[in-house]
């Protein structure tokens, strides 16, 4: 959830965990809605997170717990392509594959950029799909991760997999839909000013 905390907060507000108006305080000084979810301060958060690589480890634990308790739920976790440079990710993947956790779905946002540059230049994790296959994952490659129909098809397929965890590798465009943000690493974690915000929203609304 850390990677997309703003999306998570929006979903929680929609479900009534806290007022939607509080979303306007995202990452403000003194706000309880910060860049990393904090279970002590945010209703609906099951675990605090921060460092890259923690998400998949927690997800593996949840998936194993579900198996041990004969619970039928599935566990989904989102990773960045830069995040999978962390060794902790592959320790968790190794365990998930060895324990045949078919209730686990790992989604990799493969946009090719991370906070300090091009992923391939920083420390290349490619080919991502082959690495997950080596750890006994069923792998689904999504050619356009910004296409909702392709994503839905991938999630539908993941629900049919038995005997092994699933990794959905999505090829995405960072900043998709905003001309001056697309494929620009400088917008990693950066907030637009009022003028940039107005332009971005106009472009997104025009695109539908």
Report residues per predicted region.
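Short, small-residue-biased leader/transition segments that mark boundaries at the very start
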Residues: 1-5
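Glycine-rich ThDP/TPP pyrophosphate-binding loop and its adjacent helix/strand module
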Residues: 38-208
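Alpha-helical support elements that line or immediately flank enzyme active sites
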Residues: 7-18
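Acidic-glycine-rich active-site phosphate/pyrophosphate-binding loop
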Residues: 20-41, 72
């Amino acid at each position: 959830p850390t990677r997309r905390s703003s999306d998570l907060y929006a979903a929680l507000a929609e479900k009534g965990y806290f007022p939607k108006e509080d979303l306007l305080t995202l990452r403000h000084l003194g706000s309880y809605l910060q860049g990393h979810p904090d279970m002590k301060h945010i209703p609906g958060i099951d675990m605090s997170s921060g460092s890259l690589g923690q998400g998949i480890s927690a997800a593996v634990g949840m998936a194993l717990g579900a198996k041990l308790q004969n619970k039928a739920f599935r566990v989904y976790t989102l990773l960045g392509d830069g995040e999978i440079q962390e060794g902790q990710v592959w320790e968790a993947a190794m365990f998930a594959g060895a324990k045949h956790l078919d209730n686990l779905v790992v989604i990799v946002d493969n946009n090719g950029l991370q906070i300090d540059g091009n992923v391939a230049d920083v420390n290349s994790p490619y080919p991502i799909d082959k690495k997950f296959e080596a750890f006994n994952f069923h792998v689904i490659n999504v050619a356009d991760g910004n296409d909702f129909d392709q994503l839905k098809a991938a999630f539908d397929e993941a629900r049919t997999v038995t005997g092994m965890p699933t990794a959905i590798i999505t090829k995405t465009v960072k900043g998709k839909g905003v001309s001056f943000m697309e494929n620009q690493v400088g917008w990693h974690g950066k907030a637009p000013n009022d003028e940039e915000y107005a332009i971005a929203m106009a472009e997104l609304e025009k695109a539908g």
